């Protein structure tokens, strides 16, 4: 595993070998390795619990987060959820051993995204999962399910889990407090970043990776009810789908993708340098590490400006751009995302369209619907195309 991971790391670093991996190839290679490694971990766990005895349960491992979305970094934790039939003591022991083996040999395996978090049962039946999400799940838990995929174990059971829960994900925007819940979750994430780290935080801070991800996920959850093309796992794929369907303007969308991929590049390079999971830039005084990061990320010094200066200037622009676009898409009533699409194009009845406007944060959806219908009817085809 570690040899294979080292090969992926070397092949993703321009200048190390003649044929480096592209940014599109890297996640595919990493996820193939992760799935294979964790399938092996599950086989070891089953052997430890059952020995030579027949296996009397079905256990599916559901990948969540970056692993579920096939967006793994070089050094990532792997979020998982377990579903078993029956969910008895041996299934729980297998899941527990799977986590131990995975953590010792491969990745930090984390099952905290399961129903009720760390206080909840490690393993549940499919029926128990469905009951939980129908009755007690919070909005953020449906948001987390955007990234789920059956990874290993009993894949038919994993597919049944997906078939049962996916419809609930795409109905989540009907919840009365949906928009405010998602926005509050983003604010809580920001509050976890210490003041002295805010300017160095690539992932959680203002203008960071999470700003892009939250904006994209909000749009997916709102518009994905009626548009299945938006039901993508990876952030960049989802953003491309939002652009293609007209929910995000082409210029804004292309800019977000470029900025997001730049931050991901810095994150990848940081992990290569430190050989650990991190998304925090070096301290300003650590010029040696900053210089390495700048060079590894493709920056070369100029006559009057160092590679560090150029990297930091680019990073400032990226953060400002992400922050501006995040506010436009995430905190304002999303008129810009809806106005280009008529009710017929959205394939919604008037009542369903008003319901969607309510989910978007409009206090008077009936009035907003009237304005949008008038705008859509009055806009020429040429004007719509030019606005995209």
Regions found by a protein language model. Give the residues of each.
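A nucleotide- and high-energy phosphate-metabolite-utilizing enzyme signature
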Residues: 1-388
């Amino acid at each position: 595993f570690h040899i294979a991971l080292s090969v992926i790391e070397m092949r993703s670093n321009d200048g190390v070998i003649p044929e480096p991996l592209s940014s599109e190839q890297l996640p595919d290679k990493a996820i193939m390795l992760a799935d294979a490694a964790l399938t092996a971990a599950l086989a070891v766990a089953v052997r430890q619990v059952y020995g030579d005895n027949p296996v009397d349960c079905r256990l599916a491992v559901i990948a969540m987060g970056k692993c579920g979305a096939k967006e793994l970094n070089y050094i990532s934790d792997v979020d998982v959820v377990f579903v078993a039939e029956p969910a008895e003591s041996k299934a729980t022991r297998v899941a527990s051993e799977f986590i131990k083996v995975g953590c010792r040999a491969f990745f930090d395996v984390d099952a905290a995204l399961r129903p009720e978090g760390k206080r909840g049962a490690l393993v549940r039946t499919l029926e128990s999962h469905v009951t939980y999400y129908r009755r007690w799940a919070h909005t953020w838990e449906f948001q987390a399910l955007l990234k789920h995929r059956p990874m290993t174990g009993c894949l038919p059971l994993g597919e049944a889990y997906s078939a049962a829960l996916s419809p609930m994900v795409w109905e989540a925007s009907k919840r009365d407090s949906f928009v405010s819940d998602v926005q509050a979750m983003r604010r809580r994430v920001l509050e976890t970043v210490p003041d002295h780290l805010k300017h160095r935080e690539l992932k959680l801070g203002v203008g960071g990776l999470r700003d892009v991800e939250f904006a994209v996920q909000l749009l997916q959850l709102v518009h994905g009810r009626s548009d299945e093309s938006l039901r993508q796992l990876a952030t960049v794929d989802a953003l491309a789908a939002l652009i293609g369907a007209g929910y995000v303007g082409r210029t804004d969308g292309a800019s977000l993708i470029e900025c997001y991929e730049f931050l991901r590049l810095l994150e990848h390079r940081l992990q290569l340098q430190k050989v650990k999971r991190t998304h925090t830039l070096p301290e300003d005084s650590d010029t040696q590490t900053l210089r390495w990061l700048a060079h590894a990320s493709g920056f070369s010094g100029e006559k009057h400006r160092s590679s560090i200066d150029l990297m930091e200037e680019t990073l400032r622009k990226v953060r400002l751009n992400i922050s501006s676009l995040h506010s436009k898409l995430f905190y304002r009533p999303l008129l810009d995302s809806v106005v280009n699409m008529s009710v017929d194009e959205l394939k919604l009845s008037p009542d369903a369209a008003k319901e969607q406007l309510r989910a978007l944060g409009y206090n008077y959806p009936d009035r907003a619907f009237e304005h949008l219908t008038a705008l859509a009817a009055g806009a020429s085809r040429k004007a719509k195309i030019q606005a995209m």
